[in-house]
Amino acid sequence: MASKFRLQIVTPDRTFLDEEVEMAVVRTVSGDEGILSDHMLMVTPLKIGKMKIQIGDELKEATIAGGFIQVDQDKTIIITDAAEWPEEIDVSRAEEAKQRAEERLQKEREEVDTFRAEIALKKATNRLGLTKNK
């Protein structure tokens, strides 16, 4: 049986996860990073994307909206704006958010905060991508 480590995922409105896990895979700014027990210490930014979490025999997927990960000797902490399990995602709301972001990106550049619209589009696309695996 694989060694476990404590994984905490915290958002502004809740503790999304606080459990002993075997593995976590997150998307960092330099690519996907697999975290196991005794991983080297690190702090790095996260990209908007899916993450995988091995809890016992179950491999779970969740979305995270960027943030930071800190891997310590005792635990790993992810601080993110949002984290959701597939069953928590309101598909129609995510589709509407995606459509709004795409429409904003089509407007004149001077009228739109392009950076914010691109982030909104990435978040919506990420959420919808995870629901397709349900």
From Swiss-Prot:
GO terms for cellular component: plasma membrane; proton-transporting ATP synthase complex. It is a peripheral membrane protein. The keyword Membrane applies. Its main location: membrane. Belongs to the ATPase epsilon chain family. Produces ATP from ADP in the presence of a proton gradient across the membrane. This is ATP synthase epsilon chain. It comes from Alkaliphilus metalliredigens (strain QYMF). The gene is atpC.
